[in-house]
């Protein structure tokens, strides 16, 4: 069994390639989920102000007794707070019971309002102040990313986007890579595997490797060079999703899964969403 892999971000910081997402988890259930995840081997946890569970995440980390330098904690700036990122991050840190986060992300560009460049400039300052180690974005399209780079000279280290076998976003993934922006997949299993887990190629690979369809899809993300954050609060599934280090998909198998792409977006359109 190989060890969990880490990715080196373009600012030099290291990020676990596989983490636990906690979207929709309540403050109480997230505590047991994180404790289970830590026991299994996860060290990266992805939350957000909008998830309203940062307090639970903070309680879980505080009570777990794991050294802070072993953890990689991500949270996100919500749309309504794009004019007050400094205050928003300090509120998040208070709930998380942390002095800093490892990664702070702008949750959505909200281009119709047009504050994301100013918000990004504030994140640059927050990084300089040591309140976040790295800074990035979620759901940014190429024009949004290009504008950040053109106007501030600083590229995000991460662009976290909806990405799964039915929505592979290969052009955006490639653009990110060209600009040394690491792509991170949210909803990596296409919201519980609907339309993915029943695909013939996924079943064939699951049989071949003695794995579940979810493990095959997570391994596809890893072998495609993506950071991936499957969400679960179910102990057995948390463990299952992390048990992916003893096999790899070969090139032909990655190509076969690539053919499942339908451009099927399950979440909001980043050009329209104003949340």
Where are these regions (language model features)?
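A short, structured active-site edge motif that brings together acidic residues
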Residues: 68-81, 103-109, 163
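Alpha-helical scaffolding within the catalytic cores
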Residues: 2-7, 55, 59-62, 88-92, ...
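Beta/alpha (TIM)-barrel catalytic core signal, keyed to glycine-rich beta->alpha loops juxtaposed to Asp/Glu
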Residues: 109-275
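Acidic-and-aromatic substrate-binding clefts and catalytic sites of carbohydrate-active enzymes
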Residues: 25-28, 46-56, 78-85, 111-114, ...
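Residues at the N-termini of beta-strands
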Residues: 44, 100-103, 134, 158
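Short, acidic/polar
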Residues: 25-37, 81-97, 143-146, 167-168
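CE4/NodB-like, metal-dependent polysaccharide N-deacetylase domain
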Residues: 86-106, 125-129, 150-151
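N-terminal binding-site loop/beta-alpha segment at the start of enzyme catalytic domains
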Residues: 1-71, 122, 189-190, 256, ...
């Amino acid at each position: 069994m190989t060890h969990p892999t880490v990715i080196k971000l373009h600012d030099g910081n290291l990020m676990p390639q596989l983490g636990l997402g906690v979207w929709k988890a309540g403050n109480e259930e997230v505590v047991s989920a994180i404790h289970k995840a830590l026991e299994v081997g996860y060290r990266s946890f992805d939350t957000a102000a909008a998830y309203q569970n940062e307090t639970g995440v903070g309680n879980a980390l505080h009570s777990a007794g794991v050294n802070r330098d072993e953890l990689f904690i991500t949270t996100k700036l919500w749309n309504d707070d794009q004019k007050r990122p400094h205050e928003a991050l300090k509120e998040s840190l208070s709930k998380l019971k942390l002095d800093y986060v490892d990664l702070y992300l702008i949750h959505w560009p909200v281009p119709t309002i047009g504050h994301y460049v100013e918000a990004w400039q504030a994140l640059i300052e927050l990084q300089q102040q040591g309140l976040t180690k790295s800074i990035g974005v979620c759901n940014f399209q190429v024009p949004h990313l290009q504008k950040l780079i053109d106007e501030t000279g600083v590229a995000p280290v991460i662009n976290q986007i909806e990405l799964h076998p039915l929505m592979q976003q290969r052009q955006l993934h490639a653009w990110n890579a060209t600009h040394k922006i690491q792509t991170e997949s949210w909803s990596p299993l296409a919201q519980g595997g609907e339309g993915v887990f029943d695909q013939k190629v996924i079943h064939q690979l699951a049989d071949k490797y003695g794995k579940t369809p979810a493990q095959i899809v997570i391994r596809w993300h890893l072998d495609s060079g993506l950071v991936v954050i499957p969400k679960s609060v179910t102990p057995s599934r948390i463990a299952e999703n992390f048990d992916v280090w003893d096999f790899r998909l070969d090139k032909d198998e990655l190509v076969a899964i690539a053919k499942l792409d339908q451009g099927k977006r399950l979440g909001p359109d980043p050009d329209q969403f104003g949340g």
